Curated annotation (Swiss-Prot):
Complex and partners: Part of the small subunit (SSU) processome, composed of more than 70 proteins and the RNA chaperone small nucleolar RNA (snoRNA) U3. Interacts with BMS1.
GO CC aspect terms: nucleolus; small-subunit processome
NCBIfam families recorded: 18S_RNA_Rcl1p (TIGR03400)
Similarity field: Belongs to the RNA 3'-terminal cyclase family. Type 2 subfamily.
Cell compartments where the protein resides: Nucleus, Nucleolus
Protein name: RNA 3'-terminal phosphate cyclase-like protein
Amino acid sequence: MASQAHSLSYSGCNFLRQRLVLSTLSGRPVKIRKIRARDDNPGLRDFEASFIRLLDKVTNGSRIEINQTGTTLYYQPGLLYGGSMEHDCSVLRGIGYYLESLLCLAPFMKHPLRIVLRGVTNDQVDPSVDVLKATALPLLKQFGIDGESFELKVVRRGMPPGGGGEVFFSCPVRKVLKPIQLIDPGKIKRIRGMAYSVRVSPQMANRIVDSARSILNKFIPDIYIYTDHMKGINSGKSPGFGLSLVAETTNGTFLSAELASNPQGQGAAMLPEDLGRNCARLLLEEIYRGGCVDSTNQSLALLLMTLGQQDVSKVLLGPLSPYTIEFLRHLKSFFQIMFKIETKPCGEELKGGDKVLMTCVGIGFSNLSKTLK
């Protein structure tokens, strides 16, 4: 058993998920102090406690110690076990908050993961399940994580503040990951989207589609935005509507943007026309930033490159988000790995923002739980 002396120490509540996920994969214990120590309501929030409970479910033999006020957390990771399970997520954050971390851990379980998550499927803070399905799953497939049992499905939609959504996620396990070379994003060839509405008029979704198309039609003809109006028990507990858009390039890169309406009873009411137009503009901004991986999945791509075989992996990204920059620092702490970062200024033929080429040699991470057959 690793003693607390070998553990990594951090302070503050920021990047809690990053630290716990990397701790689980590297096997290094982590101690986090001063979690909102000066706050009027100190310690871990409900959604963070729920995340720790989820980690406890998917691992076997984890040791978690939290002090009385919840301001200090000691986490000694166990083995990633997987299997079939259910988890009730906190409605304070979206299911995407939990799913992002499961996408990092799922390929390295002992048994294939099959999990039902309940809570908020679409909110204004976390990536929605629709966007993760359209962007993160194709990215995992590039690394060789694929198969019939690789699935992410929205069974019920749930909007904040009530939630009531349900998502099914299953992922096969892999012993090793393939190195990747994603250096040419290609040109945008089609845009797909999903306009959803729950517990409001189904006409809302159609109005969102019309306003989004009014902007996007100027650039490309191949646009199709589905409308999804769930009824009855499948519509969750709160009213709301929103839009997620995904642009696909000729080389199989996916760039996404999304917007959701204000939660019931919070903020001003939002017109579906405004939401559609703003979401279309966000997608154009994401396309301008560009790269082979969109800004939501930058850290997932870098993690899978780190854990790949001992071979060179390269990926071209748009400007790094602050979350990704901190993730690179954590990768250095937990895995002693550093990336070669080259800036690629936008040339004449490459319209859009400046790009960053990230290169690393994988650590040859092997799923020890997975026996060779």
